[in-house]
């Protein structure tokens, strides 16, 4: 996916950022839940598996995976049937969990400093900086969409690399050089490699 996604602290903060809740000032909501998730990551009494499960439960409530999946598929989304769209959202949710939540052990105690926010109707952008232990500053941007009385994150950008944009370019390349069916096949292979035999793919939150 690109260099930034493999940086341990950035991965941890991506997960921390993927937490917003009741509508209000987006930054204050992100800040409140950032503290919650950061306490989970910093808790020495929790095992890695327990931390992953705790973070997953928080993140799945506040990350608009349906919107993210739709944007990641780009122009190919409208060409899919409703059942295909539903299947893709499920597969994409598993991909996000495998890529990020499974790697929270890489989190190294980095801190988050908020810089500003922009609200435009039902959309908002919260900008921050990840402060690493090496005193480097990594710019982070969370894009949120208001759904009823909640702000939900649908994209995260780190050092100008967008999660949605990154996946969209990968998915588009596979579809154009092969087919949509090949993309689904690859996602299923990745999912099956990740999921233990006793676990079934988790339906995406509607």
Residue ranges with predicted function:
Residues 94-95, 132, 159-163:
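Solvent-exposed loop/turn segments at secondary-structure junctions
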């Amino acid at each position: 996916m690109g260099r930034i996604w493999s940086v341990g602290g950035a991965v941890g903060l991506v997960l921390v950022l993927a937490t917003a809740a009741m509508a209000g000032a987006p930054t204050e909501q992100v800040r409140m839940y950032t503290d919650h998730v950061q306490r989970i990551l910093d808790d020495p009494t929790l095992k890695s598996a327990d931390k992953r499960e705790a973070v997953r439960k928080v993140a799945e409530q506040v990350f608009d995976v349906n919107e993210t999946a739709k944007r990641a598929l780009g122009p190919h989304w409208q060409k899919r049937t409703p059942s295909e769209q539903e299947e893709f959202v499920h597969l994409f949710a598993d991909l996000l969990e495998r890529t990020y939540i499974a790697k929270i052990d890489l989190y190294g105690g980095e801190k988050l400093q908020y810089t500003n926010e922009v609200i435009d109707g039902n959309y908002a952008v919260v900008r921050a900086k990840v402060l690493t232990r090496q005193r480097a500053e990594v710019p982070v941007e969370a894009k949120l969409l208001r759904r009823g009385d909640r702000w939900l994150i649908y994209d995260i950008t780190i050092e100008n690399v967008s999660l949605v944009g990154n996946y969209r370019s990968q998915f588009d390349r596979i579809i154009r050089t092969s087919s949509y069916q090949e993309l689904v096949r690859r996602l299923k292979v990745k999912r099956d490699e990740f999921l233990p035999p006793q676990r079934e793919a988790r339906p995406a939150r509607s």
